[in-house]
């Protein structure tokens, strides 16, 4: 059954446990590898006062992924079983088109100059286990939710994150 990634910024307290769990799950080497999840502090200065919010940023596994559309090498596929957007890093030539296209900055080039992103803990989900970031989040700000085929898409969450991040990418949704 396909999964949808949901993120609720009102529940994120920037504790970082999701990012650490992700790094542990993926055997990320700090200072060498690009973490698949990062915590971002967001400041809103509108309305005469400063409001601080946080966002845990990682691949949202969009239903119609722009990274897949812009990749000329065909490195991205949507897994038929889980709906996760998977990356074949070995086929990547490091052009960076996907990095520039992602509206929330969830794709990065690693130290080898190849694209890198969250794999959604596919193997965990197939075993009926939560993704590492979801398991670690005490406030349940991150959820991988099983959805029926054709269920509502993820554009609302991606657009919200894009707007909150102020990425200068026009608030595009996947």
Which ranges hold each PLM region?
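Flanking helices and flexible, charged tails adjoining ferredoxin-like Fe-S electron-transfer domains
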Residues: 31-61, 68-69, 89-174
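N-terminal cysteine/histidine-rich coordination modules
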Residues: 1-11, 16, 21-42, 46-47
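Aromatic-flanked redox-active Cys/Sec active sites in thiol-based oxidoreductases
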Residues: 8-9, 73, 89
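Short amphipathic alpha-helical segments
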Residues: 3-5, 55, 83
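The canonical Cys-X-X-Cys-His
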Residues: 18, 22, 71, 102
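A generic structural signal for alpha-helix starts
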Residues: 10-13, 17, 66, 93, ...
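Ordered, amphipathic secondary-structure segments that act as subunit-interaction surfaces
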Residues: 61-84
């Amino acid at each position: 059954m396909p999964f949808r990634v949901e993120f609720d910024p009102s529940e994120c307290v920037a504790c970082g446990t999701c990012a650490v769990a992700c790094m542990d799950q993926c055997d990320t080497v700090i200072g060498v590898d690009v973490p698949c999840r990062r915590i971002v502090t967001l400041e809103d200065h509108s309305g005469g006062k400063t409001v601080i919010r946080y966002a845990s940023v990682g691949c949202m596994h969009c239903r119609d992924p722009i990274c897949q559309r812009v990749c000329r090498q065909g490195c991205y596929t949507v897994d038929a079983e889980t709906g996760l957007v998977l990356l074949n890093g070995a086929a990547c030539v490091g052009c960076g088109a996907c990095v520039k296209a992602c509206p929330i900055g969830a794709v990065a080039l690693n130290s080898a100059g190849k694209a890198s992103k969250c794999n959604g803990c596919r193997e965990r989900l197939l075993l009926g286990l939560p993704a590492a970031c979801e398991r670690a989040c005490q406030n349940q700000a991150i959820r991988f939710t099983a959805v029926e085929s054709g269920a509502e898409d993820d554009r609302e969450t991606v657009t919200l994150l894009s707007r909150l991040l102020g990425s200068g990418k026009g608030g595009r949704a996947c």
